[in-house]
Every structure is written in C-alpha cells, then in structure tokens.
Amino acid sequence: MIYIPIGIDCDVAKFLKRHNVRNMAFPFDWNVSYNGVSKCFENNFANFSEQSNKINKYDVYFHHDFQNNAIINSDIEKYNRRCERLINILETTNDTVIFIRKGHISRHHIEPYGKDKIANDIEDVKHLHNILKNKYPQLKYKIVLGLGCDMCFSKDIIYKCDSDDNDNIDIQGIDEFSNFFEYISNTYITNINI
C-alpha cells in the first residue's frame, strides 16, 4: 500500500511518519489545504508551486516553505518533484493507494491565511474520486476522510456517499473525529500501535 496525505494539515503526514509508513514526500505533507485538493489533481498540479506569497492559487498555505527569498527556487523544485512523484504513482502503480484527509475544523474558518468559505470536505472528496476514476482507471485506491468541523457537519448525521462511490470513499463522521487516526491504524495500517 502507498499512503498519501491530502490535508487538511500536516497531522496526517506526521501520523504516517511516526508509524513508519511515510516512505516518500508528497505535495500536501506539510501545508494547509483550505479548499480541498481535487482541483490540484484535476489540473495535474499546474502552477502548484508558483508563489506570489505563502498561499497558492488552490488556497494551499505553505506554512514551512517560501519564507526565505534565498531558497524559494529550492522550495519550488522540491514541490515540483513531489507533484511529479505523485502523478507518476497514480499513472504506474499496481499497489493500492490510500489517500487520507483529516477534514477541516472550526478554527480553519477564521485563520488569517484561510478563506471565508472553505470547501465542503465531502464534496471535495467526491470530486477527487470522480477525477481519479476517470484519469486513472487502472488505479486501485481508497479515500479516507475524517470530518471535524462542527459548524459544517452534525454529529447526528451519518455521512455516506452514493452507493457506487462507497467502495472508494470511507467517511468517518464528526463524532469519530477524535479517534480518526486510531481508525486509520486499525483499518488501513496493520501491526501498528498508537
């Protein structure tokens, strides 16, 4: 299996690294993707690392990069490599790919680099699923989403996708958010203790 963090922040990459299943770097490892990631995949990550400031055209905030003018070219090259690596995996792997997204939480609505309107995590994951199945029909994958924002989602609702998407999308509700990484470990990563 190949595990690919797709946001919202660096917690997923930290979790995978801590449990020795983060074997390579990907575009969303150490940044904040306020408005989801599906548009990046849809556009083959075009202009992903072109910076006018610390947030790109996809509303991805680069918290750790693009701070020092002396190394900006190095940061651009690093993200270009990560994007190319991800696209190559999507095009060529025979392994199952597990995309993991920790959904946004209430504070993301008011962070200074965030947008007033944050993408609906479920809709973005559905859009990503449609992109993946059309662009990479041979790809075996699962998208795992943990909902976290109590302003956008209710603890009283069980969120599911359409029946034809359920094989590829796994949504964990807001009431399970505190146990999201334990769920990932128990369901998708074997022999790991949290």
Model-based region annotation:
Residues M1-I194:
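Extracellular glycan-modifying ectodomains
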